[in-house]
Amino acid sequence: MGGVGKTKRMRRLKRKRRKMRQRSK
């Protein structure tokens, strides 16, 4: 159950990686 949720969240983060990169730092 936890593995499936992590994979779906990684796919969504990959799409907003540009905006998340500036918020990460």
UniProtKB/Swiss-Prot annotation:
Superkingdom as given in the UniProt entry: Eukaryota
GO CC annotation terms, alphabetical: ribonucleoprotein complex; ribosome
InterPro entries in the cross-refs: Ribosomal_eS32
GO molecular function annotation: structural constituent of ribosome
GO biological process: translation
Keyword annotations: Ribonucleoprotein, Ribosomal protein
UniProt KW Ribosomal protein keyword: yes
A Pfam family matched in the record: Ribosomal_L41
Region (Disordered): 1-25
Record-stated family: Belongs to the eukaryotic ribosomal protein eS32 family.
Further comment: Initially thought to be part of the large ribosomal subunit. Crystal structures show eS32/eL41 to be a small ribosomal subunit forming a bridge at the interface of the 2 subunits.
Quaternary context: Component of the small ribosomal subunit.
Protein name (database record): Small ribosomal subunit protein eS32
Gene source species: Glycine max (Soybean)
Taxonomic lineage: Eukaryota, Viridiplantae, Streptophyta, Embryophyta, Tracheophyta
